[in-house]
Structures are given as structure tokens and as C-alpha cells.
Amino acid sequence: MEIRSGDELAFRRVYQEVFPTVMKVAYHVTYNQDVAEDICQDAFIRFYDKDIEFPSMDDAKFWLIRVVKNLAINHVKRKVRETASLEKFMKGPQVNPFRDGQTEVILQESTAAVRKAVSQLPEIYRTVIVLREYADLNYSEIAKVLKISESNVKVRMHRARKELSAMLDREEVNVP
């Protein structure tokens, strides 16, 4: 099935299928719901306006994920330069009324520490972590998005997890 940008019917199908995934990517790079929605909207406008033919739905999906990832990273870099900190973009998890207070505090602290550590990873490692853990892409899909080999994705993922683990160990963070 061929998908041509500018085709309203194809656009609607792509939007319905791909929006949840790109929204996860944008949110887990920016940690801001409104910004993530704006980034996704911008990416879909570019998709619609761009004169590109995609051989399949997957090709359109990977193109959109790549655009959203780049827009989100650029947004964060811009904000970091302006504020010199990602901390205000990181929201803690919502309180679960079924957990006791101590468990909730530990979970919130652990989640904040992991997010902080992920934000401090080099971009090539942070990107594979976000695409795998938050966008739920498999290694071959990540390879297509990043235009690298699947084995390179595995190497980056291994190094990212190793570096993330070392960062959390240095901070003495126990992840439940």
C-alpha cells in the first residue's frame, strides 16, 4: 500500500495509527504533555505538506517518528540553553492511592532519579532508550527510525543500559 502525503484519506489512516506512538516519543523526550502535542502536530503538518511517497505504512510511521524525535530533542536543547536545566520539564509520577506513603515516596524518588539519569545520557544512548522503553519499538524498528543497523541498535542499547546503571549506582538509587 502506497501512502502519499497530501492525500487526506491516507493522512487520516496514518494519523490514527501512528499518533499514539509519536506522542509517547515526544512526551518521553520533553516530559511535557502540551509541548509533546505541539511537536506531534508540527510533525503531522510537515507530513501532510511534504511531497513524499511512502511505500508502506511502516515507512510513513518511521519517517514521522524520526521527525518527532528530532523536533523534541531540538526543543529540549533549546530549553536547556534557556534554563540550563531539564528539571522543570520532568514531572513526577502520579500518586497511587493504593500504595502506602513510604512506597509512593520511594517510587517517586526512583522515577525522578531514572529520568534525570536518562536525560544525562549522551543523545545516541538516550534516543535508543526512549524509542525502546517509551515508544515500545523493537530493535529493527529503532534501526529503521535511526537509519542504523540492528546490531548497532543493540550495541547502543547495551551501552546505554550499562551507563544508566552506573549512573544510578553512583547516586545509590535502588530502582524497585
Task: Name each model-derived stretch.
Residues N74, E82-T111, N138:
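Internal acidic/polar
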Residues P55, R66-E87, L107, R159:
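Arg/Lys-rich amphipathic alpha helix in sigma70-family domain 2
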Residues M1-E2, A113-L121:
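Short amphipathic alpha-helical boundary/capping segments
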Residues F19, M23, F44, P122, ...:
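C-terminal flanking helix
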Residues D38-I45, D49, D58-N70:
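Structural recognition of an alpha-helix C-terminal capping motif at a helix-to-coil junction
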